[in-house]
Amino acid sequence: MSLTSEKPRGDSRPKVTIETIQGKKQRREPITCLTAYDYASARLVDEAGVDMVLVGDSLAMVMLGYENTLPVTMEEMLHHTRAARRGVKRALLIADMPYASFHISKKEALRNAARFIKEAGAEAVKVEGGEKRVQLVQRLLDAEIPVMGHIGLTPQSIHLMGGYKVQGKTLAAVEALMRDAVALDRAGVFSMVLEGIPREVAAMITAEVSAPTIGIGAGPDCDGQVLVLHDILNLTFVPPAKFVRRYADVAGAIAKAARDFKDDVEGGRYPSEEESYHLPRETQAALEHIAVRKREIGRAHV
């Protein structure tokens, strides 16, 4: 609970749109993207000037404690997207379509994607998969829903892939990735995530497609980069992937703050006089007067 009010937000920078992202590729300007799953983190990432905020299904692991992304539900994704929406004013807000939200039927896939736009305020959705997602992408575009593709290491397919493994190492695998990328590009995705693939393959795809490529573990030749916010903050409980760069130790800061708070309370150092509220003098005087009167009345009855 906080009794302080928020500072008003002022940002004169223009709103990031699909056109903004595509224009950056044309001008060869790097595109930035980070995940965020709640109001506070989304607001901070937005105010830092990041181009895109992704409410990723990775929240299953970093926010909800699941072992992988598969268990997270539509309702959980909608809940977190709504929270992020309240924090994002400038960046492009993208919501991840969770596992089984677009696999069962075309009708259900469209309904779920539309819920992200209509109910949660997302401006685009991300869908994992290559050639086999072309019809879905086109169907969503027909409903005016922008789509970000995602190929390479697709976490929703970990059981099929045999775990979190780098993809595209053989000639056949490279050719399959190229087909996936070209198919999604032709279908009309406004951008595509390339995850866990060799740098050389990512560079080939980036040169081949018109849609901006956003790398995560795909080397520096993509049009942009995305990372999980909790990874760069060291706010996870698993060893980082090779491609993760740690920019802060938030886990260490939280642990220290919690220990210091505990020690201060147990040692009688918190709260201090300066951290306590006080009665106005006139109210204090009135209470003291009442107390005196009660004592006088009590003595009179003895």
Model-identified regions with their sequence ranges:
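Alpha/beta enzyme core
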Residues: 2-248, 252-299
